[in-house]
Amino acid sequence: MFENTKKALETFRTAIECVKCKKPRGDLQYLGSSCKHAYCWECIATFQQKPSGKRSSVARHMCPSCAFPLDTSKITEAHMLKTCFDTLSELNDLLQKVGTTSLTQAEFACTQNIFNKEKTPADAVEKFLETQAHMPDEMGQLGEEDDDLMCKDENRENSNSPELDIFHDYSKEASPTRNSTKRPSTVSVHERKPKRSSILKTSVKNEPAAPVVDLFASQVPQRTHQNDLLTPFIERRSTAPAATGVATYAQAFGSSSNPVKAEIIEEDIFSKAIPLTKRQASMSASAKKQPKLEPEEPEEVPSTSRSRKNSIKSDKIERRSQSPMSFGEKSMSVKSEQRRSSYGTRRGEAVLVNSIRNNRIPQLRSAVEAGTCVNEKEDGKTPLYVAVENSSLEAVKILVEAGAVINASCGSTLETTLHEAVRRQNTQIVEYLLSKGASIKIRNIAGKTVEEMAKSDPKIRKIIEKFKTEQRVLQPVVAPPKSRLHFVQLIDEKMLTESEKRKLPGKINIVPADMDSPTHVVVTVDLKTRVLNINKEHIGEILKAIIKSGMIVSRDWLRACIIDPSKVDDDRSYMVQKVRWMEGEVFENTIEQWKKTITKMQPKLFAGCKFFIPKPKYNFLDRPALFEIIRSAGGQAAAREPIIDEKDPPPYHNANLKPNFVLYSLTHDIGDKFRDCTKYNLVSEQWLIEAILGCSITTPPH
């Protein structure tokens, strides 16, 4: 069974081969962008070997098939060939599992009957010609042998409908026919326009001139006929609202002001009123409710000018109600679900921050009720921090009641809203924030708490002492709601087969590795110890997943979702808790500590750290990957030599270190000035990786 399929499958699979060694392979690679042939890794290894007897270490290799140059420094995977090879291999395995049962006599006869029907199209040409109209000769005129066709053409011209019945049955049993209704024809056979031919018809001198076509005339045919079927000749009507003067026929049903026109519309099947959209119907109704200064008389409507100036004036009058103020008060109350992206204004600012700075409390309240995210930062500051800067107690109350994080660190100084309220000596806001759970122990980048900043202000110090002695609960930070769709990134594409990916529930979407912020990152853990062992190939991707908000889960979660789709929302049970790098120390619960820091909007690990990366590539990570990792972890990274400033504060999470870090390598020479421990911290790539995995900054050994 399936013998022919197996032979064809084997033929296709063997065709996916290396162009040099001619062996079928699934891991083929492209060398450069000039040659489009693929090579296996064994042949690539022979290319990269240094040729003997030559001084130059770089050899120029040519493709044996197309003679184009090969670039061994730019190796890219042949994804399409790999997918085809894997799919064919998987299909071959499935066919091998199928039993070798033979077809029964009835099944074999049924199959042969299908083949016989496909092999006997003897009368296909005759049936096709029967459905075609009689064509003229090559010159577009009737021949001498076509006298009997003239009668048929006259009958065709006497047809009432100007087009063929496009809704008739064109099955094999039905014959092609025209509409049965007849109409008189005033056009002779010779005056009829010839059909398309390969050679244009020559003009005749005595031929009458063709009628002038009016481009702006109605598209409905001039000759009336009784045809119950729908025709494609429908008169176009404007869809503009009735408030303007150009849409007489575009009115809602039953809203016609002229009874004569309404009567015509009901009689003419080609002039039915077009139903309006909700927005056009509402504008039409509002236009009718406006009081008119003059009584309505059956006089001619004066023609309005279509100049650019008048159109701009009318557009301003009609859209004046859509100002940012009314937009915030009316339109924002439509959606109740919370959005990550907030509304924009003419100034390009977020609507919350713009409303606070312009003291537009109604617009702020409408935006919050519409579900705008109250914790979205702009220039490093939350809307609540901006409200404290502007000393707007009412805006502060609206944002706090909507779930704004009070203890979020904002700006380059990493201060909370309570720090800013104490600096501005606003006793009302300080007392309100403390009553809602503001923390007194949080430090800023300079290491100062709120108590230390309020030493010179007795009123604020008295308020702080009052809440310090009372037993109160800090503001609880609620985790963000789960996404309706999960964007899952696989650390290794070979974790799941193509058939397993197709069986995943609809809420799970597999995304490529270059996606910025996936919701889940799937890794492989040890079955016994449940430890994630990080190798050299995936160290960069796993470090990015740890310091970002995405959840790191094991592969068992996807396999459980394939068996039971209800396991999609049980992803926290499959979170990775233990991680180890290069068979070293096992770090436990540090990934969860990173996620809590992001949720609470607290300073990240490298806050206040400045990294200098002199080498473009290190043992495990290159410079672009290091830039992304350090900046995502709250630090600064640069490839230029840093400028030493003694006023720079120390790192937030280790005040005993200097803020300047130099990333060195054992194979890279470091200048003597960077060995000064009073100004620089010499750290290795291993120290950086362990600091992220352990979520702590330790004192470097050098």
UniProtKB/Swiss-Prot annotation:
Disruption phenotype: DNA damage repair defects following ionizing radiation with reduced ubiquitination at DNA damage sites. RNAi-mediated knockdown results in elevated levels of chromosome non-disjunction that manifest as a high incidence of males, impaired progeny survival and chromosome fragmentation after irradiation and elevated levels of p53-dependent germ cell death before and after irradiation. Absence of S-phase checkpoint function. The keyword GTP-binding does not apply. It catalyses: S-ubiquitinyl-[E2 ubiquitin-conjugating enzyme]-L-cysteine + [acceptor protein]-L-lysine = [E2 ubiquitin-conjugating enzyme]-L-cysteine + N(6)-ubiquitinyl-[acceptor protein]-L-lysine. PROSITE patterns: ANK_REP_REGION, ANK_REPEAT, BRCT, ZF_RING_1, ZF_RING_2. InterPro entries: Ankyrin_repeat-containing, Ankyrin_rpt, Ankyrin_rpt-contain_sf, BRCT_dom, BRCT_dom_sf, Znf_RING, Znf_RING/FYVE/PHD, Znf_RING_CS. SUPFAM superfamilies: Ankyrin repeat, BRCT domain, RING/U-box. It is found in: Cytoplasm; Nucleus; Chromosome. The keyword Transmembrane helix does not apply. Residues 174-188 have a biased composition (Polar residues). Residues 153-205, 281-346 are annotated as: Disordered. A zinc finger (RING-type) spans 18-67. Its EC number is 2.3.2.27. Heterodimer (via RING-type zinc finger) with brc-1 to form the core CeBCD complex. Brc-1-brd-1 heterodimer-containing CeBCD complexes bound to chromatin are activated as an E3-ubiquitin ligase in response to DNA damage. The heterodimer interacts with the recombinase rad-51 following ionizing irradiation; the interaction is direct. The heterodimer interacts the E2-ubiquitin-conjugating enzyme let-70 following ionizing irradiation. The heterodimer interacts with the pro-crossover proteins msh-5 and syp-3. Interacts with smt-3, tac-1 and ubc-9. Constituent of the CeBCD complex that possesses E3 ubiquitin-protein ligase activity. When bound to chromatin, the brc-1-brd-1 heterodimer within the CeBCD complex is inactive during normal conditions, but in response to DNA damage, the brc-1-brd-1 heterodimer associates with other proteins such as the recombinase rad-51 or the E2-ubiquitin-conjugating enzyme let-70, which activate the CeBCD complex as an E3-ubiquitin ligase. This is BRCA1-associated RING domain protein 1. It comes from Caenorhabditis elegans.
